[in-house]
Amino acid sequence: MNEAEAKKITEQYLIEMQEADDTGNFDLYTQRFEHQYIKDFTVERFNSDTKAMHERNGMSQGYEFLAVLRTPDFKGNVIFRTVWKGMYEKRDAIIEFAIYQKNQQWHVIMSAVY
């Protein structure tokens, strides 16, 4: 995979997850994670996290690509991390998004808003 492919895939997943945040859709938010990495992440925690994020940031108004970062292997998987400028009603933020491929399927390993 090259940087352009990493950007394309993470942008698609970012769009899905922002929609999930804005609509409170837990299944949409978690669909790209392997269960082993989110087994303790509950609907209640998702709702609490998104409520706190909306109070701090407001609703999402868009994003802008900043960079692809190099990352070493994690448990035998090469991780592709992308960094985005998230634009929200109340402030701008940094969004870090990481994906890896396993059995021909791309998965999210991390998504964070700073």
Tell me what each language-model feature is.
Residues E11-Q12, D27-N77:
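Short solvent-exposed beta->alpha transition segments
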Residues M1-A4, R45-D49, I95:
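Short charge-dense sequence patches
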Residues L66-Y114:
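Exposed beta-sheet edge and beta->alpha loop/turn motif
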